[in-house]
Amino acid sequence: MDVKIIWHGHACFSIEGKKNVLIDPFLTGNPMAKVKAEDLNPDIILVTHGHYDHAADAVSISKRTGAPVLSVFELSEIFKESGINTIDINPGGTVEFEGVSIKATIATHSSSYDGRYAGNPVGYVIDIGRKIYHAGDTGYFKDMELIGSVDRPEISLLPIGGHYTMDVDGAVEALKMLKSPIAIPMHYNTFDVIKADPLRFKNLAAAVGTYVIVPKVEEPVEL
């Protein structure tokens, strides 16, 4: 099945196939964003953790569209206070949503929402006709080998900006374990502290057998 991936900057993506899946909606306050939160009409919203640069527009988009917000239990309980439709999950769990399979994985990071503890961060493996792994904010970790061998994502969306997540070299180490044939970098160059060169990532990844696509913001990647 044809799938379209659109990078909205930072870690925010739309994945369009059987359904329109929006991940980590950070448009408001995102210096890379070329669209506004009100321009997006997802069927479901996935949030990897509660930090503002990943969850900023989740509530407003959900209220406007009725799309449920999927996140870990603790963050989901916070979202419920806004009166939106929520779905909770935890690492290892899988949610089936109207023909789309969404599995939560671990991630090595932290999570809070407006200063409140928001559970553990996660990544997601999304089966929407193609298997796509959004790692969330994370460093590389040994269990990526299991994600690679068990879930077998065809496309991995990986942070490369360093400081708060793995950097370019770390993302290449992740690819050695994931063995995805295609990768797309994220979480870089939004702010000075996460400056990174995606072309360096592309070149290093090629040496471990992964083709890296470096899209421009709002430039669709069709697979």
From Swiss-Prot:
Family: Belongs to the UPF0173 family.
Protein name: UPF0173 metal-dependent hydrolase TV0864
Keywords annotated in UniProt: Hydrolase
Record flagged with keyword Transport: no
Superkingdom of source: Archaea
Aminoacyl-tRNA synthetase among keywords: no
Gene Ontology molecular function, alphabetical: hydrolase activity
HAMAP family in UniProt: UPF0173
Organism: Thermoplasma volcanium (strain ATCC 51530 / DSM 4299 / JCM 9571 / NBRC 15438 / GSS1)
